[in-house]
Amino acid sequence: MKFLLAFSLLIPSVVFASSSKFQQVEQDVKAIEVSLSARIGVSVLDTQNGEYWDYNGNQRFPLTSTFKTIACAKLLYDAEQGKVNPNSTVEIKKADLVTYSPVIEKQVGQAITLDDACFATMTTSDNTAANIILSAVGGPKGVTDFLRQIGDKETRLDRIEPDLNEGKLGDLRDTTTPKAIASTLNKFLFGSALSEMNQKKLESWMVNNQVTGNLLRSVLPAGWNIADRSGAGGFGARSITAVVWSEHQAPIIVSIYLAQTQASMEERNDAIVKIGHSIFDVYTSQSR
């Protein structure tokens, strides 16, 4: 993590990568699109030199649970502004429980701090915890306004869990683009959107994610580190946003989004693994 923090003040101008460098990645993504009859978007941003590559980077995809990083970043930002106390507590009511809440469902009748709610939703993808955070930061509109404030004109949140995961084709609600989300993560972790202390906290939540072991983490090169957040939704939506780095490799921000496919969850997970492996090959082959 020390290596990651060393780049916390660096946001280089974007430089488009040569098409030849990512030629194999593009071929692999296209092949997966065909095999799954899916729509796929990918972006890769090297934070050291600003080198950027994408595939369908400006197309819209359902945010699904990748929004949780943004919601928790908003909580951290609001705490810096004195608008909210992350140590304040919220009573957990049975009526507030929504589907997939592995942490919160065991704490009905108890109180949870906003900080702990972020830890729960970032590390287990607990949906009720996410709604608790949304309530504290002004709801979906508060999140979207925050995104506009930091310069993200594309990403938008319109609903809460679980409705935001609907994923209908052509529905602009609760969507992002691979390019926009990569830029926003760059601002959260390496820019001035958050203090260094809160950059470290957000990174720690992503590093400690417990539900992505079968995705990019399964093909992470030896000696590399990862901080990530995944998501899934209707109409074949599956996604992951991640930062990967090593002692010799500056942080790389990767976003992968799948949509409009009838592929099984296992097939969609495998698609993310294959795309991630192809991306990692670009960087590991350079150091051989």
UniProtKB/Swiss-Prot annotation:
Its EC number is 3.5.2.6. SUPFAM superfamilies: beta-lactamase/transpeptidase-like. InterPro entries: Beta-lactam/transpept-like, Beta-lactam_cat, Beta-lactam_class-A, Beta-lactam_class-A_AS. GO terms for molecular function: beta-lactamase activity. The active site is at residue 65. The keyword Nucleotide-binding does not apply. It catalyses: a beta-lactam + H2O = a substituted beta-amino acid. Residues 1-17 form the signal peptide. Hydrolyzes both carbenicillin and oxacillin. This is Beta-lactamase PSE-4.
